[in-house]
């Protein structure tokens, strides 16, 4: 059980896929299931020498703190929630990483996890989504931090529809009633 060469992430994902397929067979066919992404703060404020420890922005307190962002992928049918996979993400910016990564063999899973921890949230999210390709869920659900046009387009390429709150910003425009408009203008017309 303590072997670092074993791919525990893949094992957990395979077990959860099997369990989800079992639950899905027992539920009604008209019930929709979703994959849910959540990005939470994993605070490590007292830590000093944790590998890949970074300054991350906490959206609830609107401050930077030491820790990681924990990207979690889960499955739900409306009554049941099952976690499928998660990744601890450091920062993509070198100046925000407080402790560097140890030197490890590039052929190992440990190296791949360290590289993945420094990738963008969107890239890691798509990697997790591709890993869940066998899980029956038509929709991907996430909050407004992910609901950007680039993210929606990339999720659609994975043959999943998106449910999410649109981020209110002046910079992004959507086509509504034949015109390109920002979200505030669309809300005023509804």
Residue ranges and their predicted role:
Residues 1-7, 60-135, 185-186:
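Electropositive, glycine- and tryptophan-enriched low-complexity nucleic-acid-binding patches
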Residues 3-92:
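Active-site-proximal, Lys/Arg-enriched surface segment
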Residues 9, 28, 49-51, 95, ...:
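Glutamate identity and glutamate-enriched acidic tracts
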Residues 98-190:
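An internal, acidic/charged active-site-proximal segment
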């Amino acid at each position: 059980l303590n072997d670092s060469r074993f791919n525990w992430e893949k094992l957990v994902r395979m077990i959860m896929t099997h369990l989800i397929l079992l639950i899905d067979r027992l539920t009604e066919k008209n019930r929709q299931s979703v994959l849910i992404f959540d990005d939470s703060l994993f605070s490590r404020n007292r830590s000093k020498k944790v590998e890949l420890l970074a300054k991350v922005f906490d959206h609830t307190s609107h401050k930077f703190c030491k820790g990681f962002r924990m990207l979690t992928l889960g499955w739900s049918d409306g009554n049941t929630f099952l976690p499928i996979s998660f990744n601890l993400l450091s920062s993509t910016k070198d100046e925000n990483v407080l402790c560097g990564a140890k030197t490890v063999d590039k052929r190992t899973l440990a190296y791949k996890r360290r590289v993945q921890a420094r990738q963008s949230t969107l890239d890691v999210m798509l990697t997790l989504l591709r890993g869940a390709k066998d899980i029956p869920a038509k929709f991907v659900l996430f909050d407004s931090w992910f609901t950007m046009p680039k993210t929606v387009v990339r999720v659609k390429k994975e043959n999943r529809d998106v449910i999410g709150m649109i981020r209110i910003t002046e910079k992004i425009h959507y086509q509504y009633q034949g015109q390109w408009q920002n979200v505030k203008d669309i809300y005023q017309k509804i």
